[in-house]
């Protein structure tokens, strides 16, 4: 048993806190490094192993960078609003404010037990009025710039959570929070105009040091399509509608058009005979999520409206159908159907026996089956016959434009961000409604609009704040007459869309942040968190940064320069941890038994950081044995240094061998840690301890050299085992603190050995290993190999046919 324990953890945590070791000074020397882990929801009562995997290894990386001379800023806070706390309150009867404050206190205690160098003086908690005052300020600024607006729209509705969900919060047709099937509902809601930034959000992605998969996910979510907009007139009426298509070359193959069930045009054109069927279909469509409706594998459904459109080129009548695979929120809510050249249209046409008109053939004239979805040569297209797809796109749009029936168009999959929620536990939207003045933003001087405590928040589909007359009834800031407050609250993603800007200036009462300070501190240099936020938080934060830049508050384009996603720690059964499965891992129990550093090192050694894996009790025990072994070997070295006996001052063979391992380890650990490859960095330190152990068994040692080697090793170990290393550093007689020491630098010359080990093979089988001078030429190596006693015995009575020398590695002697 070693001496390392939680008592050592506590001792050094108190010392670090007393001395203000990690207090951040923006004016301190050294290049600024803003390191940020995505902050936690304090909805559960404590940190689990997954939280630790996010925070512990990144803290080690930040410590490593601090020792390299960077001025590291690593704050911590809590994403404290949102459904989890409110649902917990509904279940237990404990008010979300009370449970959140209690949970934050517990999580702060656990995070401090980790021994991380978080800058707690910069903490932010999004549910505090001091924070959400500025979330409301952000809303007002976006409203001023026309980037926040209110409209009635079909929205995603979760019947269980009784609230609206953004598109990004619907996963496979279900609520991401509770897995209930999502339906559609028409509601008047607040939106942020993220689509104004669609082009820049897409174009700047390739400039970021982000995981390729996350970049691809955002690109797909933004979904820029370059195509054409075509206008169709409705037969026997003044009505018309636009469709967006990327294949205008297939226009002459249109045999029907399809409107989304929510398209308002449907009610205007439906015939009396089809009205009941269309209404029934629209009701059914409301029960389907957008993702389900667009599934390629799902059987297509639809209903005829009884109305017809006029083809813009041929003048022919084409039937107008309603189909739920068309979304009102994408493009124009209407599509032209070309079943001969689109798989979805083909399936629909076959099901409802609609015409299928081929207008594209293969370029080489070969026979092709329908649907034929490739580019090719136009046929059955009148004046456009014989043109290639690309030529036809240009010519057809030119003709449509000359007739006032079409134009080139860029379309996006991205929709505006729906930010209002019919729930209690969120930042109130700072708006009042006045019969005289209409929508009136609350003046900045009246912020924050505080969330009342005494509110009935059980969900019933209405905003809980609407039940509080004291909250709702107010006076209009503009005319002074009675007015009503907005009773929806802001999506919690609004709170987290700007929190990284508040950390460096969290005590500012006059503004959300000082632009001069923030422009010096930002962007975040290293951001770490889960990949599940690729199309939500990470996209929203980019939008808010760009909007504030354009308002003149920021001088940078992107919030997070470099992004890393940590992997997932699974339960011992290989399944995702959950209380219901009974496979959760509580860090507290393991820390109590082994200490925080052993727990941290197991997470870093037992798993590749970006991959994760299944928890293993055997793994943490082996790391504990490794730490105990380090302690024993350093104790032996320290005792030898203290006694000063059998000392020598020369650098002989044993010293050179240890020096080689010392600098090899410095190089490897530095390179691996920089790339967040912590498991291989620790493996290198395990290898080194073998070399150090071997050296401490020498009869004579160079004790000054030994102390330097042990000091270097402790500096390498310090970011991974901060409490243990600080203790060992102190016991070695060094001044406080090891984290004020510089990171060791490797000496390339030390990696050049005087002698190298050469394996000698006879007919491909290793017979012996010998040491030779590293500068010995091939002839010399060959001679040394042939002169070796074991090789002489192995080749006796045989003829040497050939000797192959691979310098620095092996000799293969071919005999017969």
Swiss-Prot record:
GO terms assigned for molecular function: aminoacyl-tRNA deacylase activity; ATP binding; leucine-tRNA ligase activity
The EC number(s) this enzyme carries: 6.1.1.4
GO terms for cellular component: cytosol
Residues that, per the record, bind ATP: 579
Motif 'HIGH' region location, chain numbering: 40-51
HAMAP family assigned to the protein according to its UniProt record, in alphabetical order: Leu_tRNA_synth_B
Protein's UniProt name: Leucine--tRNA ligase
Lineage: Bacteria, Bacillati, Bacillota, Clostridia, Eubacteriales
